[in-house]
Amino acid sequence: MDFNSLRKKIITKKASVKELVNDIFLKIDSDDPEINSYICTTKDNAIQQAENIDKLIQNEEILPPLAGMPIAIKDNICTKGVHTTCASKMLKGFIAPYESTASDKLWSSGGICLGKTNLDEFAMGSSTETSVFGVTSNPWDISRVPGGSSGGSAASVAAGLCSAAIGSDTGGSIRQPASFCGVVGLKPTYGRVSRWGLVAFASSLDQIGPITNTVSDAAEILYSISGKDPLDSTCLDQPVPNYLINLNKSIKDLKIGIIKECFEHPGLNTEVKDSVLCGVERFKNLGAEIIEVECPRFNDGIATYYVIAPSEASANLARYDGVKYGFRSEEGSNLIDMTSKSRAEGFGDEVQRRILIGTYALSAGYSDAYYKKAQKVRTLIRNDFDKAFKKVDILLTPTCPTTAFLKGDFSNDPLSMYLSDLLTVPANLAGLPAISIPCGFDTKGLPIGLQLIGNVLEEDKILNAAHIFEIDAQVIKNRL
């Protein structure tokens, strides 16, 4: 249920916040064993938070902006006193000693924490199949994946097991599962939201953002979690506009760029292409000006990303050695042996694969050939975006080349799964804001996502365009 629907129930006193929260936990108990979107729930704490909001309502006090909204948190974001595992054996049982800035802002705004959601181990994946806690199912078809790495967050929203969820996006990990699950997923500008308390995968790419039922809900959450944070030196010290107030503006004469290279890629599914092009026509009918633009290096993004991201991951994950915290092997005969075995046993196959790729790319004799060249291509991709934004206000692409695939489809060919990020990674490489919104369905009844990309700190433009599209299209009127 979206925020506005919940607020109506609360304000008209058709239900107390405590009753609504209890109802959600009953639904989690009945539905989540099949979906497996949650790693753990925080019912006692959520009930206490709900009772506090009910007291404010009873006393007719001013309510914080997200008062009573039930929200789930991806389990690579620290929540004080609650398990933060990154869905890995390496951190299984680890309890965070502090609260992330983003989640702390949510609770200060009145949001209620329901629990921690499943993900690909250490956020490395596109299917939520690599979690030590088991595979998450897509609520639209439980034989299929929800996408990744924020698959648990997207699945929980789509299945009505929370009103909204927080995820992280390194190469598409919010937008791709949002597309697969038929919900809204927003990756803000790099630095718009503090990364303090986000377990690092690739520090120059990671960004926290919302997964919601509606664009307006995403706008509300973004406003609540954005802003300068002295604990994160990469967090931007820029004013945060009220994104919700800026919705509903006319998009007449808005210049939308259609990236030519995206629609010509041989890996793009025909049904996805046709659905997104129908979305383009809808924007045109709403008054937007459609302009074809070229980003010659857009399709080089995937190769660039899979050099830079593993390189940063190999450095970030070096801290997990079994000494101060995390999994420790009992079989090591000395410190070096213990560290080696702890990492071999604690990390799954995909995490080990990416660590090895990154270590190789950074190694002496290969850094110039791979990592430094990838950084040069990254700059060229950013330059392509700069040129495009001189002609248009926002850019439009499909979110993913395909709809949700079957579980196990890429078990024997994990590298092919990397192509799921084909259309999402360029925005991360350039640090740009991007949003995925539902635009239709394929013949199997699976959701298709449309992606809008904005210039730096221009979330308001993509949110407004997405909101106008959402109202006009009414793609998903009733949630599962």
Swiss-Prot record:
Q: Does the record's keyword annotation contain Transcription regulation?
A: no
InterPro entries cross-referenced by the UniProt entry: Amidase, Amidase_CS, Amidase_dom, AS_sf, GatA
GO biological process entries: translation
Nucleotide-binding recorded as keyword: yes
Q: Which Gene3D superfamilies match?
A: Amidase signature (AS) domain
Query: Recorded E.C. number(s)?
Result: 6.3.5.7
Domain of life assignment: Bacteria
**What does the entry list under GO cellular component?**
glutamyl-tRNA(Gln) amidotransferase complex
Write down a Pfam family by its short name: Amidase
Citing just one GO molecular function, the answer is: ATP binding
Q: Kindly identify the residues recorded as the active site.
A: K74, S149, S173
Which PROSITE patterns does the record match to this protein? AMIDASES
Listed under catalytic activity are: L-glutamyl-tRNA(Gln) + L-glutamine + ATP + H2O = L-glutaminyl-tRNA(Gln) + L-glutamate + ADP + phosphate + H(+)
What's the stated role of this polypeptide?
Allows the formation of correctly charged Gln-tRNA(Gln) through the transamidation of misacylated Glu-tRNA(Gln) in organisms which lack glutaminyl-tRNA synthetase. The reaction takes place in the presence of glutamine and ATP through an activated gamma-phospho-Glu-tRNA(Gln).
Homology family: Belongs to the amidase family. GatA subfamily.
Q: How does it assemble?
A: Heterotrimer of A, B and C subunits.
Q: What is the protein name stated in its UniProt record?
A: Glutamyl-tRNA(Gln) amidotransferase subunit A
